[in-house]
Amino acid sequence: MYYGKLPILLLAQLSASSPNSTNSQIASYILNHLEEVRNSSIRDLASKCYVSLSSISRFCRDMGLNDFAELRELITETDLKFEIASESDDPETQKKDYLTKVRESLFLVEKSLDMKKIGKLVEDIDRYPKISVFGILKGETAAINLQTSLLMLGKYSHTQLHFSKQIEYLEQADEDDLIILFSYTGIYFDYEYPNRRIPPNVKRPKVWFITGNTQVKKSEYINEVLYFSSRQNQPSHPYQLQAVGDIIAQSYAHYLAGKQKPDD
């Protein structure tokens, strides 16, 4: 189950912008009139949104796109889909089928999550002076939940709703930064990395990548990968990420409690 790049970028733009801002106005119009704007020119879109041509160009740059041509290409190739969890016409059966899949997804996390790796991540959380937790849409929800839990445990961490702001932070982070990325499908870097904007160097942050995609490997941008088994479907998506985030927080709480115990 993969979300297209356009919905990700537009929803991230809406979540991070004032409802009355020009960028929100443009993003809302595109999402509400997707078929209508598929073949629109930049002049047509500006007219329909009651904004200037320069506002459309700035909107594209704010989303990390090169220009309007790239935006129009994304609009043309976007096909919104929703995965239905049950084939039954009965509401009670629909509920049961959906929740059964949710329970199965949590069981997969229980069986597959490597607690030794969780322990290494927890040590990094305790050790690094700067912590950031990022994700996209439902991944960012898991990031915010982990941020909140860490704060309750006395560890401040940073996050950003806007995807482009996450990328900017990754560009500027250094060896004092620990960055935790939640990416259910494992394609976080595919959304805005065609030109590999982050230059690899010796003073890069340590990046933990949490995903249900076992094809993701360590790279010049990813130091550690924390896997969980996943069927990569809609019912699993938010709950598996949330479960992993909660287990990280619980493990960190136990780690802190262990540090406070007097030596025998």
Which residue stretches match the model-derived regions?
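HTH-adjacent hinge/linker in prokaryotic transcriptional regulators
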Residues: K5-P7, P19-Q25, E35-N39, S47-Y50, ...
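Glycine-rich phosphate/diphosphate-binding loops that line cofactor/substrate pockets in enzymes
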Residues: K116-Y128
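Glycine-rich phosphate-binding loops that contact phosphosugars or nucleotide phosphates
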Residues: D126-G258
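Short amphipathic alpha-helical elements of helix-turn-helix/winged-helix folds
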Residues: Y29-H33
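Short amphipathic alpha-helical boundary/capping segments
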Residues: Q13-P19
